Amino acid sequence: MADGQMPFSCHYPSRLRRDPFRDSPLPSRLLDDDFGMDPFPDDLTSSWRNWALPRFSTGWPGTLRSGMVPRGPTAAARFGVPAEGRSPPPFPGEPWKVCVNVHSFKPEELMVKTKDGYVEVSGKHEEKQQEGGIVSKNFTKKIQLPAEVDPVTVFASLSPEGLLIIEAPQVPPYSPFGESNFNNELPQDSQEVTCT
């Protein structure tokens, strides 16, 4: 290499990873004005970094989903993303839960049933005379149950705000008889003492 020549490098300073939670070299004035409004809870404006860092820098227990990941059977297999029309699998130990906004329907106009691995929510208004005409509303929504959920255990409740909350506990994992990973024998250095 001749004097004055630099080796080729793909390193661009503008493409370095940047930690959004580190202190900025230039102080931000964005949150300095309160515009006569009440401050955020826990005075978020003065210590947003201390508030955000523990919440957003911990490891995520599942796979992260990005809007850029293509949807389809191959994407689901490659990226661990559920295919379209499927509800995301619950975290271990937590119940499966889905909320459906049904605020324009009365409880007697709603029906929830499980069929062929799906929860089917349907609602129907009878024809009503309203401003300028007759109105009839109906809808049907099908939500696929995860494999970890037993369809018999699905139950639904309606909140005062008009949200239909559909829940089901997860089926605990099991192993067939004889394929257990647990050792049924007591350890040799037991803490038990024989009394005479």
UniProtKB/Swiss-Prot annotation:
* Residues where Phosphoserine is found: S24, S57, S87
Matching Pfam families: HSP20
Region feature (Disordered): 1-35, 176-196
Per the record, its GO cellular-component terms are: cytoplasm; nucleus; protein folding chaperone complex
Q: Which GO terms describe its biological process?
A: cellular response to unfolded protein
Annotated ranges, domain sHSP = 74-185
Give the location in the cell: Cytoplasm; Nucleus
Where Asymmetric dimethylarginine occurs, residue numbers?
R71, R78
Enumerate the GO terms in the molecular function aspect.
protein homodimerization activity
Q: Record's InterPro entries?
A: A-crystallin/Hsp20_dom, Alpha-crystallin/sHSP_animal, HSP20-like_chaperone, HSPB8, HspB8_ACD
Q: Assembly state and interactors?
A: Monomer. Forms a ternary complex with BAG3 and HSPA1A. Component of the chaperone-assisted selective autophagy (CASA) complex consisting of BAG3, HSPA8/HSC70, HSPB8 and STUB1/CHIP. Interacts with HSPB1. Interacts with DNAJB6. Interacts with BAG3.
Write down what this protein is called.
Answer: Heat shock protein beta-8
Q: Name the species this protein comes from.
A: Canis lupus familiaris
